[in-house]
Amino acid sequence: MAPVSNETFLPTEAWGEATLRPSFVRDEDERPKVAHDRFSDAVPLISLHGIDGARRAQIRDRVAAACEDWGIFQVIDHGVDADLIADMTRLAREFFALPAEDKLRYDMSGGKKGGFIVSSHLQGEAVQDWREIVTYFSYPVKARDYGRWPEKPAGWCAVVERYSERLMGLSCNLMGVLSEAMGLETEALAKACVDMDQKVVVNFYPRCPQPDLTLGLKRHTDPGTITLLLQDLVGGLQATRDGGKNWITVQPISGAFVVNLGDHGHFMSNGRFKNADHQAVVNGESSRLSIATFQNPAPDARVWPLAVREGEEPILEEPITFTEMYRRKMERDLDLAKRKKQAKDQLMQQQLQLQQQQAVAAAPMPTATKPLNEILA
């Protein structure tokens, strides 16, 4: 099926195209450095078996070490039913296989809360990500707008409800472990989130004609407390812990959840725990599916370190709300992108002027032409 139009181009409609559309091409310094399937086992894998019993202290220590080192780890034996995971991923793939018009019925551009979109819901981005997404605002339950939840494929809404409930329980359990690792009561982090928000984002990364020129999801840190990511076995999630000098591709593990610490979790630990620096790359052979469940504090929740260790100072100047924290983050990111574009445009203009000057300098000097009467004399 051909794309609906340039305004509604869907990456899933791009099969047969040999080149990447310009809106998806990234600057060279942002392009992938490591292949989607060059897997690393550097990210810790932690079994949660016994988390409510004798192994809790051991699990707590391993989670704390992973957050201090990477801000990212994987968990197995987490208690989320394998059949539920299978249903969620199967129905998600069925949705992205629907005709464009069925998906675009739930277009979430223009500030709509939930639904379908290409690349990102963020405004002002200069380059698009090579992905299609469906977003569910699932908690608080009273704020759900089921009119923004796709009706197709049949049964997906009910599965998303069950999935979000199980992920909320797992997230709270993990936040309890993080609270204890900071020397606090088990419920400290959950209480600091007040009435916790949850957002389920289903990412579909189609095959890409030129995967070396783009990203499925640009480099970033998540704004919230923690994120739980379910991914298939294709590979594409990448992480760095040295500011982007070196990247690794996280080894996909069937049924595991990748846990990312977000900016809020970083601030609440007073910087002890890293906010995971990550991105997603794509490939030209197969599509990839991942499902990210973002656990965020309530918009008016107070952002301030819960635990400041002896000899440390708070990493924030003053307490702020999560809404203000998020606003500042988006403002910084967009300002950085704007300044980068301005610098790129300025460099291109300088190069053009230099080329023009070189062309003038290389041109042969004009020779004087004799008058006609002298030529004929």
Curated annotation (Swiss-Prot):
Fe cation binds at H220, D222, H278. One of its GO terms (molecular function) is metal ion binding. It comes from the Eukaryota. Residues 193-297 form the Fe2OG dioxygenase domain. Its cofactor is Fe(2+); L-ascorbate. It catalyses: a (2S)-flavan-4-one + 2-oxoglutarate + O2 = a (2R,3R)-dihydroflavonol + succinate + CO2. One of its GO terms (biological process) is flavonoid biosynthetic process. Keywords: Dioxygenase, Flavonoid biosynthesis, Iron, Metal-binding, Oxidoreductase, Vitamin C. Belongs to the iron/ascorbate-dependent oxidoreductase family. This is Naringenin,2-oxoglutarate 3-dioxygenase. The lineage of its organism: Eukaryota, Viridiplantae, Streptophyta, Embryophyta, Tracheophyta.
